[in-house]
């Protein structure tokens, strides 16, 4: 998908914005705090239904207004997202109302690189599950319905566990259902990582020339037994603490460099390079399966990678023939790293000029 036009209304510090980006490389310049990252944030919203920055949706609404609208048009789709101060959300696809954000998100495959992306490798498992599940969601159609069913079952069982009102026979039903969907989710993740690792190893050779890298799945339970048996063996613990302690919701991935977890093997600078390779690997895998590129959002590239890896990333992005949005203080920092001249935009006081 390529965004042909992007319109923002009362989003962050923008009143009204209409943008016609290049289908290739776009560089957005401006001082810190000018709003250039907010432009990336609006595109991200179309692919995820939320911001990648801290805070709730009300912070996205320009002060003094009742809501914001983000609208984009591509060759095949017209997509609009509106959120109001009362929490109401409105989604539009080709002029019709849609109920589920997943129906919109599936059409807008967005890959994001920010200074905080390295936290995927350093922080808790939640961000790593989001990383892998983005990929599975976009290439395995049944994954979303499996995940919705699993999370609903998990919520119901946890509620009963907290209330201390879960008879043995009824609990068996919840565990059987959780095991069924949880193992389907885990198999989808395993298949995805098996395919993704080929791309990771290729890109690691380019970005980390002396490092061999791969990603391994930790399913969320001891896989020497079935998930049902694992749930059975943790029943007393679950009743004691009031939540389900094993399952697909406890999964994690281990990113390994030369046989050691990356956070114990690589320097801070190398970790930034490693997450860049992982994100590009996801994008390349998506492009191979879906036969169309992702949209890449890169915030503050020059502060994250050294000059050599900046040039390498820019070359990789250009070779993908993808639509790319990159923020920088000045265009001179990046424009010479692309073979073809990128389209330049400048943000100042909530106004974008080409």
Swiss-Prot record:
Keywords: ATP-binding, Cytoplasm, DNA damage, DNA repair, DNA replication, DNA-binding, Nucleotide-binding, SOS response. Its main location: cytoplasm. One of its GO terms (molecular function) is ATP binding. Gene3D superfamilies: P-loop containing nucleotide triphosphate hydrolases, RecF/RecN/SMC, N-terminal domain. ATP binds at residues 30-37. It is found in: Cytoplasm. One of its GO terms (biological process) is SOS response. One of its GO terms (cellular component) is cytoplasm. Pfam families: SMC_N (PF02463). PANTHER family: DNA REPLICATION AND REPAIR PROTEIN RECF. The RecF protein is involved in DNA metabolism; it is required for DNA replication and normal SOS inducibility. RecF binds preferentially to single-stranded, linear DNA. It also seems to bind ATP. Belongs to the RecF family. This is DNA replication and repair protein RecF. It comes from Idiomarina loihiensis (strain ATCC BAA-735 / DSM 15497 / L2-TR). The lineage of its organism: Bacteria, Pseudomonadati, Pseudomonadota, Gammaproteobacteria, Alteromonadales.
């Amino acid at each position: 998908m390529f965004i042909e036009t992007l319109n923002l209304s009362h989003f962050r510090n923008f009143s009204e914005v209409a943008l016609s980006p290049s289908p290739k490389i776009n560089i957005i310049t401006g001082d810190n705090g000018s709003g250039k990252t907010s432009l990336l944030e609006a595109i991200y919203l179309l692919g995820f239904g939320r911001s990648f920055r801290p805070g709730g949706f009300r912070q996205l609404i320009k002060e003094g207004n009742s809501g914001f609208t983000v609208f984009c048009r591509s060759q095949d789709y017209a997509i609009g997202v509106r959120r109001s101060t009362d929490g109401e959300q409105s989604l539009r696809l080709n002029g019709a109302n849609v109920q589920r954000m997943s129906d919109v998100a599936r059409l807008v495959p967005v890959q994001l690189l920010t200074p905080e992306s390295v936290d995927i490798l350093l922080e808790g498992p939640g961000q790593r599950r989001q990383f892998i599940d983005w990929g599975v969601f976009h290439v395995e159609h049944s994954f979303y319905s499996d995940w919705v069913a699993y999370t609903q079952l998990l919520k119901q069982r946890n509620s009963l566990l907290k209330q201390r009102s879960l008879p043995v026979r009824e609990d068996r039903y919840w565990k059987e259902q959780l095991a069924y969907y949880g193992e389907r989710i885990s198999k989808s993740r395993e298949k995805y990582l098996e395919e993704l690792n080929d791309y990771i190893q290729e890109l690691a050779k380019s970005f980390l020339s002396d490092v061999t890298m791969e990603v391994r799945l930790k399913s969320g339970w001891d896989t020497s037994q079935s998930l049902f048996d694992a749930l059975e063996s943790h029943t007393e613990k679950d009743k004691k603490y009031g939540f389900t302690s094993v399952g697909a919701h406890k999964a994690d991935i281990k990113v390994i460099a030369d046989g050691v977890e990356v956070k114990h093997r690589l320097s801070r600078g190398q970790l930034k390079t490693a997450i860049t390779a992982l994100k590009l690997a996801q994008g390349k895998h998506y492009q191979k399966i879906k036969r169309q590129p992702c949209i890449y959002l890169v915030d503050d590239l020059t502060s994250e990678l050294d000059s050599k890896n900046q040039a390498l990333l820019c070359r990789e992005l250009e070779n993908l023939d993808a639509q790319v949005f990159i923020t920088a203080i000045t265009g001179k920092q990046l424009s010479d790293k692309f073979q073809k001249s990128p389209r330049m935009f400048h943000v100042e006081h909530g106004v974008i000029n080409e």
